[in-house]
């Protein structure tokens, strides 16, 4: 049972997770209330995340690519949820326009899930290659770099809703940069998964190193608190600068 999460970490902030296609199905079936209650109770969640993984769905042989009614379903989900709702991308990032629509239907927080971290398009391409599905393998390979980079997505969304930076965060310095761009938090995946394969001590060592890196970046930036990084002077260069310029984002 997923309840072990709360049993092992009684004071942790626990986020339940469900896909937008499931939410849309629940809404159409008239079972939204029941399923929201079940999802919340399953892990005694402090918040519920709805992942918007359309890029992955396009490539999966079992993927659901119908998006009609998704915003209406998500709005209804937000209305009945007893806890805040996070809208979460899974590798393709969120645009400013989508961020505003999500805000308007009552979403509380954005998890940008930008390009630069795990590529589910590439993963699905490899799955298809192993199965001998050449068409989907080629589709996944062609879309492997699709999406908005994490840094750009953070900057695009941060003025609309509290924004979590996820996608390619590999160090405490990366987290500091994301916070300076306007994120309120940063999420890490792959580095911890690699350490977890080595054991608990490796995870703790990595987390301690991450903390030292973040604190060092704060000290060197004159930031007394994490939120002070948002006031740090930013210099944005290269492709990220060009993305922001073309999108008209400061």
What is each of the regions a protein language model found here?
Residues 32, 67-70, 146, 150, ...:
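Generic structural signal for well-ordered, non-membrane alpha-helical segments
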Residues 1-101, 105, 119, 124, ...:
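Active-site entrance/lid segments in N-terminal catalytic domains of soluble metabolic enzymes
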Residues 12-40, 146-166, 170, 221-239:
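Electropositive, surface-exposed helix/loop patches at the edges of structured domains
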Residues 4, 38, 76, 101, ...:
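Alpha-helical scaffold segments in soluble metabolic enzymes
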Residues 192-250:
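C-terminal extensions of enzymes
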Residues 10, 41-44, 79-82, 104, ...:
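Generic secondary-structure signature for well-ordered alpha-helical cores
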Residues 68-198:
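Glycine-rich phosphate/ribose-binding loops and adjacent secondary-structure elements
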Residues 2-14, 70, 108-111, 130-136, ...:
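Short, structured secondary-structure boundary patches
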